[in-house]
Regions:
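RNA-contacting regions in translation and RNA-metabolism proteins
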Residues: 1-150
Length: 150
């Protein structure tokens, strides 16, 4: 049977947006086993939600829908208004500032709970720092990153 992940994702998202009363333009692009979906329209803040939680939830659901019928695993990345890149920059900046604080106060800093993707951004941002190290603790979905002196 002809399986088209882009079409599956689009059909699902159109139904969701229709139910929400939102008019959203959906642009999909598939590269290998990755499906990138960019959403444009008014009120995209509603789709982003607090710290991207709504966008993450929607991405999770699209992932389930696409992979239900896919013969191989497809990674789905949902974005709007360049939110993912902006969030990455915010998290990197936060990581650098908190690392400074740890060096100055010599006390650990525990960040708010984050999803694995966001925790990875923090770990990557500080991996080459000679004075601090990072690790994750806690149980999903409430795992947080701890920044500590080496």
């Amino acid at each position: 049977k002809n399986f088209n992940p882009e079409k599956e994702a689009e059909t699902f998202l159109k139904e969701v947006f229709l139910s929400m009363g939102l008019i959203v333009k959906i642009k999909t692009e598939q590269k290998d086993k990755h499906l990138y979906i960019d959403l444009t329209g008014d009120d995209m803040g509603i789709l982003i939600g607090k710290r991207g939680q709504t966008l993450d939830a929607l991405q999770y659901l699209v992932n389930l829908v696409v992979n239900k019928k896919s013969p191989y695993y497809i990674s789905v990345m949902l974005d709007t208004e360049n939110y993912r890149q902006r969030r990455k920059e915010t998290l990197e900046s936060l990581a650098f500032n908190l690392a400074k604080k740890v060096k100055h106060t010599k006390r650990n800093v525990v960040l708010e709970p984050m999803n694995p993707y966001e925790r990875r951004i923090i770990h990557s941002a500080l991996q080459n720092d000679r004075f601090v190290t990072t690790y994750s603790e806690g149980e999903e979905p409430y795992r947080n990153v701890v920044i500590t002196l080496k």
